[in-house]
Amino acid sequence: MAGVGIDDIAIYFPKLYFDMKDFAEFRGADFGKLNKGLGLTAMAIPDAHEDTATMGANACARLIDRNQLDPRKIGRIYLGTESALDGAKPTATYIMDMLEQRYDDTYGKECFRNCDVVDLTFACIGAVDAMHNTLDWVARGGDEQDRIGIVVFAD
């Protein structure tokens, strides 16, 4: 079995922030518990044009660019989320569509043709399951296959 692991992590945070003092006041929550107990001072919130898919696509693009990955060699993009956009279609398909638009001039249309995309939706465990599943998939490829999988955690 091939040695597998996490090669890199890319993070995308929205640019808008909500002050936790304001949040606590608005929600009638104890700011001390949020600030001292959880260490929170602000919370990132998506802009009007941002959602789970755009944030996931931004993080994926950073990862692909930084590691000079060929999208044609990426075999899967698995998304762990609590915030699905569509009741029937996986949000990961929207991420893949945005990535195809970004890379089609360089790698050709449908450069993610052989990429499997799935959402795993179950609170925080969905992302952990996506990671374990992808690590197992890479390991099962053996040393002769150079499998590349991307796991996205987005909410």
Predicted features along the sequence, with ranges:
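Conserved catalytic cysteine-centered active-site region
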Residues: 33-51, 84-147
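Short, flexible loop/turn elements at secondary-structure junctions
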Residues: 10, 121-124, 153-155
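Short beta-strand segments
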Residues: 80, 146-155
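Long, acidic, intrinsically disordered low-complexity segments
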Residues: 75-83, 87
